[in-house]
Each structure stands twice: as C-alpha cells, then as structure tokens.
Amino acid sequence: MWKRGVGALLWGMVLLRSFVAYADSQAATGGLLKEIMGEVASIRLESNMLKQQLRERHAESAALKKALQTLDVKLEKAAKALEESEHALSESKELIETLRSELEILRQRVNALNMRLRRLEITNNVLIGVAVVCGVAAIGAGIYAAVK
C-alpha cells in the first residue's frame, strides 16, 4: 500500500516538476531544462532502486515467514512428543509403584511359606522320630512277646 503511495508521490513530483519546467522553460534557457530533466531521471532511478529493494524485502519476508511456519510445526511436534513422553513416564511410574507393592506382598507370602515349611520340616522330623521310637517299641514288644 505504501509502495503505491510512494509511487504516486514520485509521479506527482515529476508532474509538478514538468509543469514548473514548462512554465520556466519559456523563460529559462536550455541548460536549465536539461538540469530539470536530469533531476527527473535521477528521481526515476531512485524510484526504481526503491522498488527493487522493496521486492527484495518482500522475498526475504516470505522466506522468513516460511521458516517461521516450519519452526512452528517442529515446535508443535516437539510439544506433542514431550506431552506423550510425560504421559508415558507417569504411567511407567504408576506401574512401577504397583509392581513394588505386589512385590512386597509376594515377599510377605514367601516369608510366610518359608515359616510354614520350617514348621512342617520340624513336625516331619518329630513324626519321623516318633515313628522310629514306635517302630523300635513295636519290635521290642514283638521280641518280648516271642520270648515270653
């Protein structure tokens, strides 16, 4: 928009100069007219340079906008990946806590089973001892009955 304004302003200056040049040309010499035409040419050259710079800035702006969009997409992907990893980490922590509590319960059960096993081994040893004593007593009773 401002490019059009600058262009219109420059053309207005050219037209103003040409009207002034026309009015002065009748009274002025040919050298003055050449000087004015040189000014017009320099203004046109400057206008063209400004237009070229404006085109270059638009190209740079478009490239920067594209780069910004690319970075924005990458940022969104990174944020989504971070959110997913945080969620996975949270789930992993919950699973670890659950496994720890289950492991503690299993340890308690193993300890209880070990205690029962020890009691059963002791009871078994006592019963084996009683059986041996009973066997010896039965053999002794059999021998006593046979001798009698």
Curated annotation (Swiss-Prot):
Domain of life: Bacteria
N-terminal signal peptide: 1-23
Membrane-spanning parts: 125-147
Ranges in coiled-coil conformation: 49-129
Subcellular location(s) of the protein: Membrane
Membrane topology recorded in Swiss-Prot or TrEMBL: Single-pass membrane protein
Key words of the record: Coiled coil, Membrane, Signal, Transmembrane, Transmembrane helix
Gene Ontology CC annotations of this record: membrane
Protein name: Uncharacterized protein TP_0222
